[in-house]
């Protein structure tokens, strides 16, 4: 099988892979959301990028659909038809959207993909309700198909949800811990949080597709672990974009994570470096950081090597994901498509 380093040379295939999977999943996703209460369905459609407030067709592009693509490719890589992965794809997309709805509320993020977050557009209570509905709908989606693998798939999704909540809880608690000292957040704690918060659902997406296609347990486990490594790399990418990302691309203010005092990996790595004391003093100031202060903080993180070290860790996580996929017995063509998708995500990170 082609290693990830080789796949990195040809990332243009990824957009076509994502488009194919989105088009396959879209009818089932639309049908599932359409069964909700009309008001809740509108909020869900808005969150998914299908419509604007009031239900008019969306004028902005929707998300890439990485998780649903992983479920479809997981089914194909296990030797099954793409359609076998569709229930898993719908379920993980609904759970992902539910998590974003609640995450934006907890973090106070007013923007999502360049427009008001659901809680800003519709209100906090309605956004919580829409998230709850999507969570319930995800479980229902997996139980609807009369397949011998549905029960195992629901158990797998439930375990991923448990980890997702654990990761989100850790992320919220990190905010109250000091920047330095014995109570500060350690890099190992960050890795555990990222695997749960982001990696659990990516691993679940790959594993669900394979599971619904009837793959053996070893293959399902290998794909789940690969997705978890991918999730850590994905979270690191978000951390980097949260400090240095272009607002036109991210839809969020530049240096937003620094302004909010988030314990992201580039910052944690910079704090452990020799020049970390100045950064800790700046971030630990009781006064809110103004534009000048957050720009200086970003500079200090980069000078201390936090940005470069985070990039290295992202590459290491991607290599681990690639190694796990190489160890599994996967159908050649879908496996190559998975690698092309990993390549795209690697470029997003690097």
Please identify what each model-predicted range represents.
Residues 1-95, 101, 105-120, 171-184, ...:
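Conserved N-terminal diphosphate/IPP-binding helix and adjacent helical/loop segment
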Residues 14, 18, 22, 40, ...:
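Hydrophobic packing residues in well-ordered alpha-helices of helical domains and bundles
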Residues 30, 34-40, 58-64, 129, ...:
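All-alpha helical catalytic cores of prenyl diphosphate-utilizing isoprenoid enzymes
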Residues 40-44, 110, 241-250, 277-284, ...:
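A glycine-biased, small/acidic residue-tolerant capping/turn segment at secondary-structure junctions
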Residues 42-91, 137, 141-143, 187-230, ...:
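Alpha-helical phosphate/pyrophosphate-handling elements in metalloenzyme active cores
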Residues 46-47, 91, 108, 156-160, ...:
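Short acidic/histidine-centered micro-motifs embedded in hydrophobic/aromatic stretches
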Residues 59, 112-135, 180-197, 224-225, ...:
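Divalent-cation-assisted or electrostatically stabilized phosphate/pyrophosphate-binding catalytic cores
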Residues 99-100, 231-235, 269:
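Alpha-helical transmembrane segments of multi-pass membrane proteins
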């Amino acid at each position: 099988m082609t290693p990830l380093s080789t796949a990195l040379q040809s990332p243009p295939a990824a957009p076509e892979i994502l488009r194919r999977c989105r088009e396959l999943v879209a009818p089932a996703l639309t049908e599932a959301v359409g069964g909700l209460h009309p008001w809740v369905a509108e909020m869900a459609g808005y969150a998914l990028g299908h419509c604007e407030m009031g239900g008019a067709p969306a004028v902005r592009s929707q998300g890439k659909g990485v998780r649903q693509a992983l479920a479809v490719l997981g089914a194909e890589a296990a030797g099954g038809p793409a359609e076998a992965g569709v229930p898993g794809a719908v379920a993980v997309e609904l759970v992902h959207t539910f998590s974003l709805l609640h995450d934006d509320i907890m973090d106070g993020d007013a923007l999502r993909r360049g427009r008001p977050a659901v809680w800003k557009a519709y209100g906090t209570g309605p956004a919580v309700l829409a998230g709850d509905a999507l969570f319930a709908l995800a479980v229902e989606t997996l139980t609807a198909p009369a397949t011998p693998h549905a029960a195992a798939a629901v158990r797998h999704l439930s375990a991923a949800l448990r980890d997702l909540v654990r990761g989100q809880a850790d992320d919220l608690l990190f905010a109250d811990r000091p920047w330095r000292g014995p109570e500060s957040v350690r890099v190992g704690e960050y890795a555990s949080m990222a695997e749960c918060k982001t990696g659990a659902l990516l691993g679940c997406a790959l594993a669900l597709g394979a599971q619904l296609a009837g793959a053996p347990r070893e293959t399902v486990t290998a794909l789940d672990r690969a997705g978890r490594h991918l999730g850590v790399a994905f979270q690191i990418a978000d951390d980097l974009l949260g400090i240095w990302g272009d607002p036109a691309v991210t839809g969020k203010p530049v240096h937003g994570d620094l302004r909010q005092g988030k314990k992201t990996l580039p910052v944690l790595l910079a704090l452990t470096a020799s020049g970390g004391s100045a950064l800790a003093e700046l971030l630990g100031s009781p006064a809110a950081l103004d534009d000048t202060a957050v720009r200086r903080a970003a500079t200090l993180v980069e000078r201390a090597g936090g940005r470069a070290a985070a990039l290295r860790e992202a590459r290491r996580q991607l290599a681990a994901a690639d190694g796990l996929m190489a160890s599994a017995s996967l159908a050649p063509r879908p496996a190559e498509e998975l690698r092309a998708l990993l390549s795209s995500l690697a470029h997003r990170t690097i």
